[in-house]
Amino acid sequence: MTTMRQIQLTEWGDESVLHEANVPIPSPVRGHVLIKTVAAGVNPIDLTTRKGLGPAAQLADPSYKPFVPGWDVAGTVVATAGDYTGFKVGDGVFGLVAFPSPAGAYAEYVLAPAHQLVKVPADVPCAQLGGAPLTALTAYQALFEVARLKEGERVLIHSGAGGVGHLAIQLAAQAGAQVFATASAPNHEFVRSLGAQPIDYRTEDFRAVLGQTMDVVLNSTGQQTFLDSLEVLVPGGRIVTLTSPDPLDVARERGFEAQWLTVHPDRMQMQEIARLMSLGLLKVHVDQVLDFSQAAQAHALVATGRTRGKIVLAP
């Protein structure tokens, strides 16, 4: 077999620009391993990039070279370049690959930098592994690298049932924080099972519910929510946003620590995520697993903002 299935686009646009192609399987190069993909997570940044927006789109020109979405990959090493990478053929691996440069994870085979991969934990379903890297790293970096969340602190996590949110709840609870999360009523039992006290964003004003009691807020739902969240922070509190960095100065002028996070690959953090997954302390909720041929449907589902956990593609 010399060719593989790959989902690509040759112009930015809506999900209709995604199409399947047969292309040559890449050959291993130094410092990389060739992975046979088992599962690839679908993330909001995939949709943003597909539209020609965001940092990843600035690094690609689909009219010159077809762009292949995706940065989450889980699979099996099938070839190396012969140099030492720490992996051998047959190893199961997963990771956030090359972000924000093009990684091409929506493909049957992915050529990935070895230093961004870790071995898969035993007895964790493949779909969970494929759905974990970007969202788990985002949650981990937001809470511990940027916000420096500590045991006993109180944290508000917006969109608690979403890809980042449901993992952030688990990580914060494991760290000994008191966790609150916004979610729609149908997701309250789910959010509660993860370790958070749910707040119905449709019928409740989280500012009135919480008062000025939060040490940390993780925002992934836009500028107005960011600004409203300042009302629940204690003096000197910390807020991390995953959306536009525009309102950061407003928060800083009021004495809060405010940072905008763009996730980055980190092998040591991935090893900790793998450890937690192996112990059953961090579980990726997979809403649906779809075939690569259903990539457009996967993007449409993520675009609704109403999926629980992750959408995952499988070849």
Where are the regions that the model predicts?
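NAD(P)H dinucleotide-binding glycine-rich loop of Rossmann-like/cofactor-binding domains
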Residues: 63, 86, 96-159
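C-terminal hydrophobic helical "lid"/dimerization subdomain
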Residues: 2, 270-315
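Short, surface-exposed secondary-structure boundary micro-motifs
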Residues: 38-39, 80-82, 98-99, 160, ...
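A glycine-/small-residue-rich N-terminal strand-loop-strand element
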Residues: 50, 72-99
